[in-house]
């Protein structure tokens, strides 16, 4: 006895293959870890309560870094700010896009052994980060020597969708130095 199967057109076969592939990708894609600092964060001025900048924290091979992805400039400040007091490869580069947080290693909800740079003066500080239990706040602490001698900020998590892809701005060469009032 010979079994016969209906013949499927090549278009139907391709559609079926694509559907299977897409469902496999969706099933295999890891769910975001709500206890991870990876994501988009808003830095808020402690005095005014106004947002100052956004950082995108990423992880590669167990090491976390934070790049500045948005800066809220005050009226009259130079929007083409470059880090002229930074050391090494960062010197003279636009602050927007720089990795200001580097070398963080995760230890539960804490991130340790990293550094944070102040782009206004190029100073590099040791740093710690601690994620809140609900994953919506990130305490970022920069310090000299021991953690006791430092300063902390609390950043607020933003949805990753808040950072819509936009084409890079087309501007002339960026002037050097921190933002200056005009």
Describe the residue ranges of each PLM region.
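C-terminal segment of classical bacterial N-terminal signal peptides
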Residues: 20-28
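Surface-exposed interaction patches
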Residues: 109-154
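Compositionally biased, proline/threonine/alanine/serine-rich low-complexity intrinsically disordered stretches
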Residues: 29-32, 163-182
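Bacterial N-terminal signal peptides that target proteins for export
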Residues: 2-18
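N-terminal helix-cap/turn-to-beta initiation motif at the start of protein domains
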Residues: 27-39
């Amino acid at each position: 006895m010979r079994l016969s199967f209906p013949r499927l057109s090549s278009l139907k076969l391709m559609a079926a293959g694509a559907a299977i592939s897409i469902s496999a990708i969706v099933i295999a894609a890891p769910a975001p870890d709500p206890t991870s600092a990876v994501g988009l964060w808003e830095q808020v001025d402690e005095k005014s309560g106004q947002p100052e900048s956004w950082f995108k924290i990423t992880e590669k091979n167990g090491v976390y870094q934070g790049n500045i992805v948005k800066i809220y400039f005050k009226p009259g400040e130079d929007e083409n700010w470059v880090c002229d007091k930074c050391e090494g490869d960062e010197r003279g580069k636009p602050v927007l896009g720089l990795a200001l947080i580097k070398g963080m290693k995760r230890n539960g909800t804490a991130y340790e052994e990293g550094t944070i740079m102040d782009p206004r003066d190029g100073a590099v500080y040791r740093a710690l980060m601690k994620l809140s239990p609900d994953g919506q706040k990130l305490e970022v602490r920069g310090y000299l020597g021991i953690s006791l001698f430092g300063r902390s900020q609390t950043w607020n998590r933003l949805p990753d969708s808040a950072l819509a892809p936009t084409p890079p701005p087309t501007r002339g060469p960026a002037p050097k130095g921190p933002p200056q009032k005009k």
